[in-house]
Amino acid sequence: SPIIVADEDIENFEMIQKKYVTPMAQDAVKNKSIKQWALIKKVPGIGNPDNKTNYMWVAAFDNINQMVNRENWWSNTEKKFGVPSEVIYDSPDIVRRGRYIYKTEKQIQTDKPGQYVILNWATPTNLNKMIELQGSVEKHFRKNIIKSGMVGWGMATRIVPQNKDLPTAFWWDSYDTLENAYKHLVGQGANEGISKEINEEFNKLIPNGWDNRVIFEFVTGAN
């Protein structure tokens, strides 16, 4: 879920997320309400300055049943901390930019924490062929995952909302440092040595290129 936090509220917002929300997210993971949760923030100075989104809440679920039946775990503040949620969340003001749900199609997970993640959106001309191609991409990335600094990768397809102006596919590339994330963007990192055939097929499936690519930094999370 993308959100906007005013500059003057950032310090207080992150404090609340780390001190209160993260422990409750850890409880939710333990109780099988969610699989993972994270707060990430946009690396400043990149992209369109008119796009004010600067944070995202990211939640992962084991299945649809878990997603639709999960409790509002973030509201358990009084039980856990003795403070009503309306007091904790009274400030700062947060502008929510909607909720977007994806189905993970391919994924690489490691036990190493990622510090930066590249978020990529595109609209393939043939979504099924793109998913199939990601099997070859995954095999290549797994060969380079240690030496490149990549600690996670995945590809997902959009479930909701759906309309003609929204990309249908989403990728994430998680790295240990900002430098290694930038290397990925210029064809190095885990991309290095990928076959010409894979690149050509990928570019053929997204002839207009990426719809959007941004870098976010990990703030806090639970898994």
Question: What positions do the PLM features span?
Answer:
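Short S/T/G/P-rich N-terminal loop/turn motif that feeds into the first structured element of a domain
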Residues: 1-77, 86-223
